[in-house]
Amino acid sequence: MDKDKGSIIHEPLVPRTFRLLAELEKEGDGIVSYGLENPEDNTFTNWNGSILANNGILYELKIVCDNNYPKVPPKVKFVTKINLPCVNQSNGEILPNSLNVLKNWNRDCTIESYLQAIKSEMDSNLTKLKQPPEGSKF
């Protein structure tokens, strides 16, 4: 709220496509990475992701940014089998509200911040929980 005028200042919303294009150009940090499943997809809906865990295993993920992104988080699903409290063990999907980034999702959150939160969960739990054989898929 502008203290001098008593009015609310609204920042313009960046269109979904521009936002996702900016995220695509960033692509992650090598430990956490992501990109379009199909480089010709001008809807920016279907993405691939990967997370290099501390155990040296590269975990693959599928990411879907529907038309409500970034207002709502993308759907994220592990392709590589993993045992984590935040993952549905029957299909690999990240459970709703299982991570702080999901509980506190807002337009400033990104695909990268979501994947970083998953990486943090992996760092905390991979060695504590029995994991499926390397290379197994959901």
Residue ranges and their predicted role:
Residues 1-138:
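UBC/E2-like fold recognition across ubiquitin and ubiquitin-like conjugation systems
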